[in-house]
Each structure stands twice: as structure tokens, then as C-alpha cells.
């Protein structure tokens, strides 16, 4: 089992570290073997408005990268397929250059309006069928060697609420080294009545009970908790919500709402270690959203399995 810290090549993340060795010392000090990298546009303190390819980021060396998280598009089903292929191949090529052992791909379809209003336009199975077809277009005939791990969210797509949906996704995807990346916090969003981490662990065990035959396919875990059911209930009670007409303002309020929902905080309940042991994945990524290097260090220590 390998342990990763999530990291992006964005300005907010890279400016926390002074060099590749500084970054390496940091994640090793906090119990990680390497990084799960999302290759976003790279910029520096000296020129924050100049965006460069992720591959030029000097902080990240190939021997530091265990996994690559694709820069996933949540609203994609009506977009041009050739452009989508180009978008994702760029990330897959980055993963290949870095020697990544796995990549992560979101199986979801949601637009800004849906995430804001909760009025969904597709069923889980519709999204799963479309995603499987697209994944086959993306991967068929290629010579990739990494695991292709499909991640759950709480919007239409792979949610782990129905084992038949997960089985259908696996069955339809041709790629041999396929599996799941279970995001624990994302799954918790499917139950708005959870109020503490012990209940969250029990909820995840119940999901595993329902997916027993699929547990061997869970090759990775994004280990985090996000108990925001009360926020979601209040949001729904205050409906209807209308998006601003201005695109920039609309983008801002949607993501402000999403970050209130999906907090990515340390999962520290006593039962978390047993949950991970039950799944026995190849990879565990401590996937957090933090505001500083100091907060990231605090989160990594709190969520570190050996400290629970």
C-alpha cells in the first residue's frame, strides 16, 4: 500500500514550496511515499499571470509521482468528443512521462445549474453508459501501462449507491487495468443525515457490504471526510436558487457553494484504519483542500492512518 499527498501544479500549491527537495522532504515527513498530481496550468510568484504547461513545473520530478489526477470536466456530455480526447490525452501523456502508476478519472456529468439547483438532467446509468463509451474512445488502441481508476462523486454518474451501476461501468470499459478510486468524502454526500465520523465509517461499511464483489476493484482511496449534510439540507430548504446571469459571477457562486459542500478534511475516526484495511487498496491518497502549507501539514498529521 502506497500513501500519497494530493498536489497540483497551480499557483496556490507550488508557491508553498521552494524546491523539489523541499516538497519531497515535506511529504515524507508527513508519512507519504509520493504525490498524486493534478497537472493544472503552472505559474510562478514572479509571473503569476503567465500560465505554462504543468510539465515545466520544477518542483515535480518523476520519482515523486505515484498517481496523476486528470483535470476532469464535470459538464462534458454535450461537448465536442475530439476536443475532449485531446484534453484528456494531454493528462495521460503527462502521466506516462512521469511514470505514474495510476490515473484518476471522474465519472460524472453535472453543469453549474444542476449543482446549484439540484435539478438533475441525467440518471446515473445514462452518465455511466456515456462515460464508458468515452473512456473506450480515449483508451482503446493505446499502450498505457497505468491503472485507470474511476472516481465516484455524488452527482449523476458513479456514486456507489447502486452496485449494478458500478458493475455496468466495469463491464463496459475495455481497458484491462481498470478499477475504482473510492472517494470517502464524496460518498458521504449521498447521505445527508450523517452527523459524526463514526456514523460516516458505518455508512461506508454498509456501502462495501452492498458491493462485496467489487471491493477487489477498489485500487485506490481518496481518504477524506466531508460531513456537510446540514448545509445541504438548508440549501435545499432555501430553494429555489437562481444562478447569476454574468458567467464569471455564476462560476464564482457555484464553486463557492461546492467548496461549502465538499470540504476535504481529515478522516480521523477510530474505525477509519479498519475501513482501509478491509478494502486493502494499492493506493491511499490523503486528499485535502487547504489554505496554507501549515494547514496542509496539520491535516496530514491528523489524518495519517498510523496516528489514528
Predicted features by range, described:
Residues 80-179:
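Active-site acidic/histidine proton-transfer and metal-coordination neighborhood
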Residues 10-21, 37-52, 74-85, 113, ...:
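Acidic-and-aromatic substrate-binding clefts and catalytic sites of carbohydrate-active enzymes
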Residues 25-29, 94-97, 137, 172, ...:
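Alpha-helical scaffold elements within enzyme catalytic domains, especially in hydrolases
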Residues 2-13, 33-37, 62-70, 103-105, ...:
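Hydrophobic faces of well-ordered beta-strands that scaffold small-molecule active sites
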Residues 1-2, 85-90, 99, 175-182, ...:
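Histidine-acidic metal/acid-base catalytic patches
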Residues 54-71, 127-143, 173, 211, ...:
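Alpha-helix-loop-beta-strand connector modules within alpha/beta enzyme cores
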Residues 15-24, 47-53, 132, 137, ...:
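Distinct, well-ordered alpha-helical segments
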Residues 1-96, 306:
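N-terminal pre-domain/capping segments
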